[in-house]
Amino acid sequence: MGGTADFVLSITIVLVILIIIAFIWYNFTGWSPFKYSKGNTVTFKTPDESSIAYMRFRNCIFTFTDPKGSLHSIDVTEVLNNMAKGFRDAQNPPSSFTLGGHCQAPLNAFSFVLPGVNDRATVATADDAKKWENCDATLTGLQRII
């Protein structure tokens, strides 16, 4: 009975060590920083032409100023991860995707919406939208292929 218990204990220890190594590998290696500023076309591309569905994002923050000069930030990590995961079931998944889709709109204060600040109801007229033209916007975060 002692031999079986020792075997189970050693297997458990090995599995715990492997889980710790996998956790460290995923969280602390392979993440590449990115930064896009106002006017940049935001395109995420896999380095080896693999499917974009395997790209993951972390700590992605969209920051913008409003016409009054107030600074606003939104965590868009989940949005970007869901955009990439959306290609999982595609017949021929691409190796890149661009914010704005086929329009390839450059990064601006409307690239992501913060309700009550830069949404359609708040920016109701063309004059309101024109005030936003000179507002700064940045998108920063980390990306990796899993």
UniProtKB/Swiss-Prot annotation:
Q: How does it sit in the membrane?
A: Single-pass membrane protein
Q: What is this protein called?
A: Uncharacterized protein E146L
* Compartments (UniProt record): Host membrane; Virion
Q: Keyword set for this entry? A: Host membrane, Membrane, Transmembrane, Transmembrane helix, Virion
Q: What induces it?
A: Expressed in the late phase of the viral replicative cycle.
Spell out the family assignment given in the record's similarity comment: Belongs to the asfivirus E146L family.
Query: Quick check: keyword Nucleotidyltransferase in the entry?
Result: no
